[in-house]
Amino acid sequence: RRAKLGMGYLPQEASIFRGLSVQDNILSILELWEPSKSNQKQKLDALLQEFSISHLRTSSALSLSGGERRRVEIARCLASEPEYILLDEPFAGIDPVAVGEIRDIVSALKDRGIGVLITDHNVRETLKIVDRAYILNEGRLLKSGTPDEVIQDGNVRRVYLGEDFHVS
């Protein structure tokens, strides 16, 4: 139902289909959305190339690194051509190199016109890529605004970020 409304979702925990290859993970969604086998193949090839995972096409999902797994999950999510994607803790459980890759992928999604909503405790990485931020405290909105507005807010620094917080 969510996908039919144009919403993609990537949970924090691994959502890859472990018993499938990389290409079969993506095809599992394409087959639901694209009736033409030739169009499925074209879209599969495009997604594999876009996310630099073509060389992993026949690899088992179990053999992937955290960053590779995340790229496959994002490619699979895009197979349904969502208008918006909710990313739950996209920076959790991945190595520092993969953090940069995920940041680049999120920027590319924004450039494609896909709305991206991120929930993450890794504020430093998240504030580097968002246009607007919303800081919640005890279930209430503490501050919303641009990353700079949020970082400079005294209450946010006192309650959540800490006085010495900076984005480097």
Where are the model-predicted features located?
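Conserved ABC ATPase signature
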Residues: S60-L64, E68
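Hydrophobic anchor residue at the start of the ABC signature
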Residues: I74
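Conserved catalytic motifs of ABC-family nucleotide-binding domains
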Residues: E81
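ABC-type ATPase nucleotide-binding domains, specifically the catalytic core motifs of the NBD
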Residues: R1, L20-N39, E50, E163-D164
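Conserved ABC ATPase "signature" region
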Residues: L27, S38-L56, D104-S107
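Catalytic Walker B motif of ABC-type/P-loop ATPase nucleotide-binding domains
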Residues: I85-E89
